Amino acid sequence: MSVIQKLIDDQDNQDLKAYNEVLSEDYYWLRHSTGEKVPRDELSKWLISPDAPKTESSRIIYENDEIGVAHYFISFKDGSRQAVLVAYIIKDGKIIRSETGATNIPK
């Protein structure tokens, strides 16, 4: 199974331990909106929480041992939706960084 698919499945299954095993200890998510670096533990707790955005659909565009690209449609509690493109940097079988770009989808 691909690293990205495992990450997607672990998030869908709300499995925090398995989710964190896919990410390196020094992993961070570079937020597209602010440039802030969000560390693994902070991101994973949010994504597995009841306040997390819901993934409507996902697809892996490309993945090899060094990089992966995936596209998601997500929805938020307030009813807003986004199309999100994520680039994952992979090293030694773990994701070490991800960066996102998002487009708001009109209601």
What residue spans do the PLM features occupy?
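A beta-strand edge to alpha-helix "cap/lid" segment located at domain peripheries
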Residues: D12, L30, T34-K107
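Short, well-ordered alpha-helical segments enriched in acidic and aromatic residues
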Residues: N13-Y28
